[in-house]
Amino acid sequence: SSKTYDKYGRVVKEVSNTNEATDYEYDKYGNVVKTMNHLGSVTDSTYDLLNRKVSDSTDGKKTLTYSYDAKGQLVSTHDSFTDKTDTVKYDALGQAVEKTDKLGNVTKTDYDAKGQVIKETDAAGNATLKEYDIYGNVIKETDALGNSSQTHYNAFGLVEKEVDKRGFAVSYVYNDK
């Protein structure tokens, strides 16, 4: 794949490995206002005065409308094609604690005192737990069935070893370059 950039370092064209191109246009604030895919479909995006995306219209039809709370946090995305809405609820610290998708499925997220995700619970009640080292790196992740994966880091914070849920390990070695 390849990317072409404008003089401001923004991607203006992406070409995939299958030679499918996507073009991007920006407003004076750096917001993507137009996206054209390899099939010629065009998505126009609009923004409010705070540069928050408020809508996406594809091929002239408004499809997505974004709403924000007083703190500027995205609280809903409405799809006019399906007439369904995704919503997000936040705690007092501005952390997303509950997400409801278009089908009504609720995902809940718990955080530790450092703001790190420690538990994610899906709509079926399945929880994934995360543990961190003192540097904020995820060192263990445990799924609802009790299967764990672990990541070990070296003194430089680089991944030294990963052990997946089946117990298979991959070790990493770094050179001086």
Where are these regions (language model features)?
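Beta-strand elements of repeat-based all-beta scaffolds
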Residues: 1-16, 20-122, 126-143, 147-177
